[in-house]
Amino acid sequence: MSTSTEQIRQKFTEALDDLVAQVKKDRSILAAILCGSLSHDAVCAKSDIDLALITVDDKKIESSHLSLCAGDANVHAFLMPRAAFRKTVEGSVRNSFAHSLLAKGRLLYTHDETIAQLCESLHGIGRRDTQVQLLAAATQALPPVYKAHKWFVARGDLDYTALWILHAANSLARIEVIGAGLLADREVLPQALKLNPPVFKTVYSDLLNTKKTRPTVQRALDAIDAYLAQRAPMLFRLVLDYLSEAAEARSCTEIEDWFKRHFDVDCVATACEYLSDQGLIARVSLPARLTKVSNVAVEELAFVYQGAPPDEF
């Protein structure tokens, strides 16, 4: 770490210490958790401080955000009653953004030992949480992958194809990091590049640092296609299990509603289209009506699992 960086960190730390000393005197604040770069990463002069403040449970106190001054530093504080914090910790999907932000944070002080215990529990990542986050990352990767193929094949625009590949690369990086059992934060691409250099050099750093040609862009698309295809049974485990247990066709509306309600995951119909293209499920149709008062039935896209139950992840 350079001298200037050390000086900046020292300046931020001193400003934070002064603010926390003030906050400790507030009887309505039970704990302070330092989040963001200052808690676990490098900072620069333009950095700010992210601070979670856990308050007492009181009907007059609601979760809120407040921008504070600490010396020359800007502090983004989010206040959360203890009950809401507990609900967030116990109910948050592990490796979601909220979970990662708090799990990588540092408890500065607490007047309530149960808050310390809740913070400690953040470091566990369950199997089900991993499956949900892998599914979410994979469904987010598919649309930009399709866009990249479209702009490459139909338009021949290498720059715009590369842009969509880079969009997809961020979701692929989440897959790589989560699959390795690590916490995925906003800086997943550098993490993934260390974990899997051959793939992420091709779909990320090479696209940024070398001249784009049809062969290099094609290699990036091929690398993405192979990456997803090799991992499809793992990434879409929850979808395969759902359709396998249903033992009959489910419409896209039913599928989307079920995954949104149970896991808060969108775009699962797109995932089903991909799985159908991969031969892992079958594309069928079910009768549907366009409105509640329609007198004509149309065919809605649906999917069915055909084959032995999926292997365990």
Where are these predicted regions, by residue range?
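Conserved NTP/Mg2+-binding pocket subregion across the NTase superfamily
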Residues: 2-8, 69-157
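Generic hydrophobic secondary-structure signal
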Residues: 16-19, 23, 29-34, 49-54, ...
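Short, structured coil/loop segments at alpha-helix boundaries
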Residues: 9-13, 23-26, 94-95, 111-119, ...
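Conserved nucleotidyltransferase catalytic core and NTase-mimicking acidic/glycine-rich helix/loop elements
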Residues: 129-287, 291-294, 301-313
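Charged, low-complexity, helix/coiled-coil-prone segments
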Residues: 34-45, 77-90, 103-116, 164, ...
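Short charge-dense sequence patches
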Residues: 1-5, 52, 86-99, 112-124, ...
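Metal-dependent nucleotidyltransferase catalytic core
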Residues: 2-30, 35-47, 52-104
